[in-house]
Structures are given as C-alpha cells and as structure tokens.
UniProtKB/Swiss-Prot annotation:
Temperature dependence: Optimum temperature is 40 degrees Celsius.
Record keywords, A-Z: Luminescence, Oxidoreductase, Secreted, Signal
pH influence on activity: Optimum pH is 8-9.
Further remark: The shrimp has luminous glands at the base of its antennae and legs, and ejects a cloud of brightly luminescent secretion from the base of its antennae upon stimulation.
GO terms for biological process, alphabetical: bioluminescence
Name under which the protein is recorded: Oplophorus-luciferin 2-monooxygenase catalytic subunit
Organism annotation: Oplophorus gracilirostris (Luminous shrimp)
Keyword Signal appears in the UniProt entry: yes
Major enzyme class: oxidoreductase
Record's GO cellular component terms: extracellular region
Keyword flag Transferase: no
Catalytic activity: coelenterazine + O2 = coelenteramide + hnu + CO2
Leader sequence residues: 1-27
Amino acid sequence: MAYSTLFIIALTAVVTQASSTQKSNLTFTLADFVGDWQQTAGYNQDQVLEQGGLSSLFQALGVSVTPIQKVVLSGENGLKADIHVIIPYEGLSGFQMGLIEMIFKVVYPVDDHHFKIILHYGTLVIDGVTPNMIDYFGRPYPGIAVFDGKQITVTGTLWNGNKIYDERLINPDGSLLFRVTINGVTGWRLCENILA
C-alpha cells in the first residue's frame, strides 16, 4: 500500500511538472522571435532585386547595388525588417537619378560616393501570439490558428505563379486580421499586422 501511494505521488509530481512546463511554453516574448525573424528576413542580392520588384529597374540602369539587411525593434512588441540598398552615384546620369528619386521618393546619402534607398519588408507584431500561431508560420496551406485567444481561419493563395503564398488570418466576422506572405521556394516570410 505504501509503495502504491509513493508511486501515485511520484506520478502526480511528474504530471504536474509536465503541465507547468507546458503552461510556461504558452507565452512568448520578443526574444523568442528574434533569431527566426532575422533568418527569414535575410535576403541575398538576387532575392532583394527579384522579390522587391526592382530587378528590371536596376538592370536597365546598369548599376551594381549592395543590399544590407536591417532588423530593428519596432516599439516594445515587434520587429521591423528593412533592406537598405546601397547604390553608387558613379555612372548614374541625371535622368537615371531622377528616375530613382521618382520611384522611391526618398534617397539617403551614405557618403560622397554612395546613397541608399530603403525597402520596408514588414513588421512582425507578437501581442497575443500563441503556439498555434507559431505552427502556422510554417504552413503554406489553409488551416486554423489562434490569435489573441480567438480561433481564426487561415487561407492560402498562390500569387503570380511564383509559389508565393499570401496567407490571411480571418476573424469569424470576416475581417482581415493578420497576413503572412511566404515564398515557397526561398522560405522567407513577410509578416504584417493589418489591424486598423
């Protein structure tokens, strides 16, 4: 009888410990996302040109560019990913420079020989994100996710035949809540919180 009691106590302790561990994993902080966001926001030069829709422009201008990834805090609860594209002044005509300024509106001087444009690739906001939401990031197909305690539907669409999935989280009332764009080839994600 004593052995049975001890076994039950030990088993209860194990279950309780597992339960408390599981509960502790139900909340995430910004630090939990930093590594993944930096990795999935990483673009090489070809990806920046292609996915940023800039390939034809820079090919026509005949200039070499250097993309630099910047991942910064965006408030207390989000990460913002930008790509800073460094462009040399050398070799650009007045017409070409005017074209760049017309398209990108703002150019930023870097030094006497270079300027940059900034491509904004979205902000990841993590308020209310649950483990189900984490699972969703790797699923380029329809499913169910939980956001801020509410169950919502995820829909996946193929965009432009380029294996880019534009996935949306939709509230029960049909309003759009959160969007994640996943490139099925390279695996990068553009995460946008689109709450009004």
